C-alpha cells in the first residue's frame, strides 16, 4: 500500500516538473521572439539613422569640396581636401564594400609602383651611366 502512495506522489511530482519545464520553454521562446523583434526594430532604426548620417556627411563634404575647389588652396586646406576625399571613399565603401576593397588594393598597388619607380629610376640611371662609361672605355 505504501508503494501505491509513493508511486502516486512520484507521478504527481514528475508531471508538475514536466509542466514547469514546458512553461519555462514557452516563456523562453516567447522572450526570444520578442528579443528578435526588438533587434529587428533597432536594426531598422539604426539603418535609417546611418543612411541619414551618410547623406548628411556626403552633402557636407560636397559643399566643402566645392568651396575649396575654387581658387588657390593653402597647405592646410589641401590637407582638409585629402581628408574629405578619404571620408567620401569610406562612405562609399559602406555602400559597396567589395568595390571599395578593390579600389583600395588598386590604390595600394599604384602607390607601391610609384615608390618602386622613385627608387629604381635613379639606380637604373646610375647603372646605365656606369655601363655606358665601361662600353666607351672598352670601345
From Swiss-Prot:
Signal peptide interval: 1-18
Record's subcellular location: Secreted
Tissues showing expression: Expressed by the skin glands.
Signal is among the record's keywords: yes
Propeptide stretch(es), residue numbers: 19-43, 74-118
Residues modified as Asparagine amide: 70
Biological process, per Gene Ontology: defense response to bacterium; defense response to fungus; killing of cells of another organism
Residue(s) carrying Isoleucine amide: 138
Keywords from the UniProt entry: Amidation, Amphibian defense peptide, Antibiotic, Antimicrobial, Cleavage on pair of basic residues, Cytolysis, Fungicide, Hemolysis, Secreted, Signal
GO cellular component, one term: extracellular region
InterPro entries to which the protein is assigned, alphabetical: Bombinin
Principal location listed in the UniProt entry: secreted
UniProt family annotation: Belongs to the bombinin family.
Known function: Maximin-4 shows antibacterial activity against both Gram-positive and Gram-negative bacteria. It also shows antimicrobial activity against the fungus C.albicans, but not against A.flavus nor P.uticale. It has little hemolytic activity. It does not possess a significant cytotoxicity against tumor cell lines. It does not possess a significant anti-HIV activity.
Protein name in the entry: Maximins 4/H3 type 5
Organism of derivation: Bombina maxima
Organism phylogeny: Eukaryota, Metazoa, Chordata, Craniata, Vertebrata
Amino acid at each position: 500500500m505504501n508503494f501505491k502512495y509513493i508511486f502516486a506522489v512520484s507521478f504527481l511530482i514528475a508531471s508538475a516538473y514536466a509542466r514547469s519545464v514546458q512553461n519555462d520553454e514557452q516563456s523562453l521562446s516567447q522572450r526570444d521572439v520578442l528579443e528578435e523583434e526588438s533587434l529587428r526594430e533597432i536594426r531598422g532604426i539604426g539603418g535609417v539613422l546611418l543612411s541619414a548620417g551618410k547623406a548628411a556627411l556626403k552633402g557636407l563634404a560636397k559643399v566643402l569640396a566645392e568651396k575649396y575647389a575654387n581658387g588657390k588652396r593653402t597647405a592646410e586646406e589641401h590637407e582638409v581636401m585629402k581628408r574629405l576625399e578619404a571620408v567620401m571613399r569610406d562612405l562609399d565603401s559602406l555602400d559597396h564594400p567589395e568595390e571599395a576593397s578593390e579600389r583600395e588594393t588598386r590604390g595600394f598597388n599604384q602607390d607601391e609602383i610609384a615608390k618602386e619607380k622613385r627608387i629604381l629610376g635613379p639606380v637604373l640611371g646610375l647603372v646605365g651611366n656606369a655601363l655606358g662609361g665601361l662600353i666607351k672605355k672598352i670601345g
